[in-house]
A protein has these predicted regions:
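Extended beta-strand/beta-hairpin segments
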Residues: 1-49, 60-135
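Alpha-helical metal-binding/catalytic segments enriched in His/Glu/Asp
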Residues: 54-55
Length: 135
């Protein structure tokens, strides 16, 4: 299987991940509370962001398949860390959709596919995923 991402440790608790097909680069820094500079996303920030991105992406796929428009959205993400062991204990997502005319049936479809997205299903069951949808 061909590689799709190249990750380099570049010193000072920083990494660079390159998406090989597009050459897009994501930089991570260790957070200040974990001996880093905190000048970029931390790896755990990316986990929280990936959860939200996955949810909104599968919602878009659902809308396309069901032939309705998914309104643009803005989400706010809160990541809660625990210390023993150091891990993400909770991710809170608030996903706000622009003015829309979605039916209640389509809203329920969108919520269901979001909660069942691949990232949500891949995370440890001990991690609390609190999602607020504002349509």
């Amino acid at each position: 299987m061909p590689h799709s991402i190249e990750n380099k440790y570049v010193g000072e608790l920083r990494t660079e991940s390159t998406h090989l097909k597009s050459s897009n680069v994501i930089i991570t820094d260790a957070p200040k509370d974990n001996n880093g500079k905190g000048n970029a996303f931390s790896p755990t920030d990316l986990v929280a962001s990936a959860l939200c991105s996955c949810m909104t992406t599968v919602m878009g796929i659902c809308a396309n398949k069901n032939q309705f428009d998914l309104p643009n959205s803005t989400a706010y993400i809160t990541k809660v860390m625990s210390s023993h062991p150091r891990r993400i204990s909770k991710i809170i997502l608030e996903i706000n959709f622009d003015n829309n005319n979605l039916s209640e049936q389509n809203i329920e479809k969108l919520k269901a596919v979001a909660i069942g997205c691949p990232v949500a299903q891949s995370l440890n069951s001990d991690l609390i995923q609190e999602v607020r949808f504002n349509f």
